[in-house]
Amino acid sequence: MATIERRPACDLYHSALQVEVPEARFVIEQAPVADLSGEQRGVVAAGAVGSRWAGRFRIFRYEIRLWRNGHIPDVIEAVESPRRLASDEHRARRVLDVVAQVPTPVWGRDELGTGEMWNSNSVIAWVLARSGIHTESIRPPAGGRAPGWRAGLDVAHRQEPVTRRAGVDRLTGGSAHA
């Protein structure tokens, strides 16, 4: 694909989050539907892979997990990770609160008109942006790309004005006016 797009080849990265609050650790990720026991993995949403039609079959579905005491299977292979993005409990809880609201377009497609396909990076970028975590400084490791990241940010920012017009602070839920 890099050759077709006339850009240098680089490593590709997959995003996931681990959120710690006093009572538990949660893993947030988008992954293939493994079996029919989604509740054990904290599945809060699901979508199709490739096409809506194919999504009728489990092999062509993904799930969004908010997995209490879950684990990221390939975390030991992570590059330049983990990265602490916030340290206060309020922000951590806000991240947990927005996960179930994440859009679930077809994975690998640009159904939301962002110019990038929707994937695991889109989900994590959307969750961070909608929860009030500053995403401007988050970058993939040197020499790498995180396809779909911009799609998640774009969709989150499209939704942001609705929240601000309503006069509600998207981080605290309180009034946005001082």
Residue ranges and their predicted role:
Residues 1-113, 159-161, 165-171:
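Non-catalytic ligand/cofactor/substrate-binding and regulatory segments of enzyme domains
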Residues 24, 129-137:
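Short helix-capping/linker segments at secondary-structure and domain boundaries
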Residues 109-131:
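Active-site nucleophilic cysteine motif
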Residues 31-33, 140-143:
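An acidic- and aromatic-residue-enriched active-site/binding cleft used to recognize and process polar
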Residues 14-15, 118, 126, 149:
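Tryptophan-centered motif/residue detector
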